[in-house]
Amino acid sequence: MRQYFIFCLILIFFSTGCADKVQYPFQDTSLTIEKRVDDLVSRLTIEEKVSQMASSTPAIERLGIPPYDWQNECLHGVGKIGDYRVTVYPQPIGMAATWDKESIRKMADFTAQEGRAIYQDARKKEKFSSYYGLTYWSPNINIFRDPRWGRGHETFGEDPYLTGVLGKEFVYGLQGDDPKYLKASACAKHYAVHSGPESVRHEFNIEVSTYDLWDTYLPAFHDLITEADVSGVMCAYNAYGGRPCCGNDLLMMDILRNQWNFKGYVTSDCGAIDDFYKYHKTHPDTISAAVDAVLHGTDLDCVRDVAFKTLVRAVKEGRIQEEKIDESVKRLFTIRFRLGMFDPDNRVPYTQIPLNVLESTEHKDHATKMAHQSIVLLKNQDETLPLKK
């Protein structure tokens, strides 16, 4: 309760217009986000830095940093909210059947509105657990090649071009168009070459040709990163070329960070870092897996066994430089600053969205429209149907 009490005092401080009387530079809204993040991270101990690299982060009370949980979903409307009623849209595979870019952008915009309203209300009620945040691990832009894959309905189908086009509209709608603040944070997943089989996803080593990699599996990620400025990427469970995706030289360093110049944050899929040593058998233990993941640009460990908690020891033993930890923590705090989480509500354009947008008539009407649009009639020209026994 003590951290909640302190957090409430911070909210009162900001809401009463006293935010200009800052104690630290990172609280000064006149500075650039980059300078504010640099100042904040410079004040953290190594233990505090590492604590911010798991999906459920604790408060840093001495600096007034509230707790935050990164995990959330909005594949077709805000997901997994038990105590709020939200608008549910067709599954992405149905959205793809509409071929309607405007409808998908509007759906994502409406979803961000509902997510913002929930976040503001949950914050007032001191709800800091999973699925109340503004970092949505959506869209799923994997390629649906095999109908036996049980999560294919989360995708926009088998076409790399269409997936990229619709994925961009999703990001545009969700993140908004404010030059400073994100309406919500989108995250392109699962990077990369992740299209089943589901049962062995934690240990499967994908083998595809270089042509297929670039022609089929990477185009949508390229489009969302270089054109739509998606703020997050989730690295996948599987391995590619014998190395787990979250610690893969080609995917994470050469392509994502260097060729595409991605500056956002990367989260692991939940438990993917533990898979390095448990199932892929590419690393001997937790600490080596955690170090390798961070060195390859994975910033956030979606918790299972919380592999990243070993990073404090790794720094003290000289296995990784603290500067590499700083890079990841700065990327993470940059997202939170871009979401306006450290600014007075009256400075952030999305903080006044009311709860009555949840399941509003406008949103429900659009969901119905998209459902109608998604119905596809196959031409039965040669009387293929009904199937003969």
Predicted feature residues:
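Bacterial Sec-dependent N-terminal signal peptides
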Residues: 1-23
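Glycoside hydrolase catalytic-domain context in secreted enzymes
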Residues: 17-389
